[in-house]
Amino acid sequence: MSAIVDIVGREILDSRGNPTVECDVLLESGTMGRAAVPSGASTGSREAIELRDGDKTRYLGKGVLKAVEHINTEISEAVLGLDASEQAFLDKTLIDLDGTDNKSRLGANAMLAVSMAVARAAAEESGLPLYRYFGGMGAVQMPVPMMNVVNGGAHANNSLDIQEFMIIPLGAPSFREALRYGAEVFHALKKIIHDKGMSTAVGDEGGFTPSVASHEEAIQLILQAIDSAGYTAGEQIAIGLDCAASEFYKDGKYQLGAEGLSLNAQEWTDMLATWVDKYPIISIEDGMAENDWDGWKILTDRLGQQVQIVGDDLFVTNTKIFKEGIDKGIANSILIKINQIGTLTETFACIEMAKRAGYTAVISHRSGETEDSTIADIAVGTNAGQIKTGSLSRSDRMAKYNQLLRIEEDLGEIAFYPGRAAFYNLR
């Protein structure tokens, strides 16, 4: 038995300079696990609640001392003596202790920090790397990265309404090479943007934030960079979009300020379909607003055979909401964000539900990140096949990519990079 003998929560800062929660868990053997939780900018309204202090005299009200106090008192009392290797029981203990549907009493940030730290301690105790602890000997598949090289929306201060324009190196032979493809395109894009006299400043997730006239111009810049780096768009590198459409959905219309357009769901779907026909787009995330389920059905029926349609704000890593979407034939993929739900056990259940339904699961970071690289191990440990963890700059993003390099090295010859096969939801 790997009994938990001590637990310590603390307030640290994330990649945006905002407070977040870190937790240390000590086992009776002396083994320690540490984890830090991320935080989002564009958040779904049905996400588990991230507990903030609301004290405007500290960190503009964003302090997390209440969440930390919950770890150091109530949660500590409940989990001391529990077996760290019994993750499901530990997470159920946390859920029952909180007693709410959305983890608003203890805070999902407090609960997730404990859940992750316990898993890290248990993996260390067992002598296994974290990905192997999660997935056993079957964990051999590396994820295809979705790299956010142009930022807009809530992640940037520019004219773009769409939040992320991503490159997806699905033609690479390995994860290591996929990372190289992405880095070389990133640097080619930087030169192109610079030569056009635009700013090469980066957004929250490390992508560039150029002030372009339209969304298509942003796509064309990326295609130019792919070509300049010596790669073939569509074959070696595809494009993905995260529209984060809830952010520009107002009064029943999709308001595209960059184009000066106000579109209903059918018109917005037509516009996305035009882009899909014109450009090598293979994935569209949050193409409709989280509450526009009719719009989601229109989008899925129109493009769901040829493009990965990812629900993020739509499903918020919640199996109850996700099941409703599956039953209604909405989307064909789910974005997995551990802090949207608040425990590892619930996260894994959502990934498993996706696989059973023939949906893909994309493991994702948040815009406010830390040096914690747990999601890299989750991506491999669950054989998810895809990961979304930012651009090719900022050390908070590189922490995940570099961990994946280590995992691929550790796997050696049995490491498998799925490439286009990761999009098994497409026909």
Curated annotation (Swiss-Prot):
Coiled coil: none annotated. The keyword RNA-binding does not apply. It comes from Albidiferax ferrireducens (strain ATCC BAA-621 / DSM 15236 / T118). One of its GO terms (cellular component) is phosphopyruvate hydratase complex. HAMAP family: Enolase (MF_00318). Mg(2+) binds at residues 242, 285, 312. NCBIfam families: eno. Pathway: Carbohydrate degradation; glycolysis; pyruvate from D-glyceraldehyde 3-phosphate: step 4/5. It comes from the Bacteria. Catalyzes the reversible conversion of 2-phosphoglycerate (2-PG) into phosphoenolpyruvate (PEP). It is essential for the degradation of carbohydrates via glycolysis. It holds the Pfam family Enolase_N. This is Enolase.
